[in-house]
Amino acid sequence: MKRYSRVLLVCFALIVVTSAATDKSGEKKASPSAPDKAYLQKIWDGWSTLDPANVAQFYASGPHTFFDIAPLKYSSWDEYQKTVTQVLAEFKSAKFTVNEDAELHPAGNYVWGTATVKEEMTHKNGKIDMGAFRWTMVFEKQGGKWLIVHEHVSVPTQ
């Protein structure tokens, strides 16, 4: 136990020293064209069309994990798009607004962010659903574009 504590202490000390020695100019930076709140809103404006093809340009292709309200997870954009298209077919209109609490955190070729999003969706039968949900996303710069490589959408169980 004593040896484990020493190893842990040494690791902690190395982290502190390394962090303190980091040049301020070497801090986390993203390119000037990193995602901002307007970019986030552009993504949700695309979702407001109820056609996932209109937001495909914002998502990385390949094996990436996306968590939506249901089902448990999607393992690729293709899988996500196929299922979401069926769900969205039940609606005639939608409006999504990224709230002022949106935060983006640059980390080199990645940017991670969080926001709450206000939603108003009208079913084909006229019923209106209104509420807010949580949105967490990770962007990666690929081919000069910021693409979502991981996303999590959830609703509180209130």
List PLM regions with ranges.
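Hydrophobic pocket/interface hotspot
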Residues: 43, 55-56, 63, 80, ...
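Short, low-complexity N-terminal intrinsically disordered segments enriched in polar/charged residues
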Residues: 20-61
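A short hydrophobic beta-strand element
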Residues: 108-119
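Bacterial N-terminal signal peptides
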Residues: 8-17
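A solvent-exposed, acidic/Ser-Thr-rich amphipathic alpha-helical stretch
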Residues: 34, 52-107, 129-130
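Bacterial N-terminal signal peptides that target proteins for export
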Residues: 1-8
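Beta-strand elements of well-folded, non-transmembrane domains
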Residues: 119-123, 139
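Short beta-strand edge/turn micro-motifs at domain boundaries
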Residues: 132-157
